[in-house]
Amino acid sequence: MAYGLLLLRAFTGAAFAGHGTQKLFGWFGGHGPQGTGGFFSSLGYHPGVRMAVIAGLGEAVGGTLLAFGFLTPAAGTLVAIVMLNAIAAATLKKQFLLGSELELLYLVIGISLVATGPGRFSVDRALGWDDNITGLWWAVGALVVAAMVSAVTLTTFRSKPAPQAATQP
């Protein structure tokens, strides 16, 4: 099980951090803060560039922490916050699970690793923290915090869509 958790955690964390560096620096074919900010603005997030930087930091920091198994509850919570916002943005455009599968997968993996712990090959284990900061209640807490932060983000930094003009039959 230790090797499976290491593989899952390291790959997921690295991939998630890679998405963050796309937003922050334009690495790996990303568009950087300006390009990603325009995309965020098109989803109704304002200011778009600031939200792109915040999402990029959440992904880069959360992914790096997850990859190393360091502060795993914080890492899983960061992953969940960013992914809940991404899923909500897609859902508000009436596209739930039409392109949101990756976001849902990251969310489930992040919260699952909070529940199981990072495994034997992790910084948390090396520091003797893994048994104290994992489990069901840590996962529930991480999900609740993520939902609350996401709700605040969606209600504070996302504008409501403009009313659609009525069409004649």
Annotated model-derived regions:
Residues G26-I54:
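Membrane-interface interhelical connector segments
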Residues M1-F28, V49, L71-P169:
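Extended, low-polarity transmembrane helix blocks
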Residues G18-H19, F40, G63:
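Generic signal for short, ordered secondary-structure residues
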Residues P33, H46, L65-A67, G110-I111:
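Alpha-helix boundary/capping detector
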Residues L57-L66, V82-A86:
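Hydrophobic, membrane-inserted alpha-helices
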